[in-house]
Regions:
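STAS-like cytosolic regulatory interaction modules
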Residues: 1-53, 65-124
Length: 124
């Protein structure tokens, strides 16, 4: 399977909707798009991972590197996991939790709440 990344804007937030598999082969594409967002001067980024069916440790590495990049330029990164999965069941959430890095990310249930500066993230 491949990785697809669609870009949109909601308020001040750039939203990258990611679908498919996030792994060794496909992860560089997401990394490039995150870097392009920063190069364009945008500092608020939502990664919508609700369409990601598989994520390996390389994919998690790209998520961590994206967080580091956004923080280094005083930006913000928020993740969206599948509706129920944000709390328990999604593959991505399970991988993040198993690797002990879920707590590093602000996770929201949908784009609307992720792009709302008053909304609270889902607890880890």
């Amino acid at each position: 399977m491949t990785l697809r990344v669609d870009e949109s804007v909601q308020g001040t937030w750039t939203v990258l909707r990611v679908s498919g598999e996030l792994d060794l082969v496909t992860s560089p594409g997401l990394r490039r798009q995150v870097h392009a967002v920063v190069a364009d001067g945008r500092r608020d980024l939502v990664l919508d991972l609700s369409g990601v069916l598989f994520c390996d440790s390389i994919g998690v590495g790209v998520l961590i590197a994206s967080r580091r990049l956004m923080r280094s330029c005083q930006g913000r990164l928020r993740l969206i996991l599948p509706a129920r999965g944000a709390l328990d069941g999604s593959h991505v959430n399970k991988v993040l939790a198993a690797l002990g890095v879920r707590r590093l990310f602000e996770v929201y249930g949908d784009v609307g709440s992720a792009a709302d500066d008053l909304a609270e993230p889902i607890s880890a």
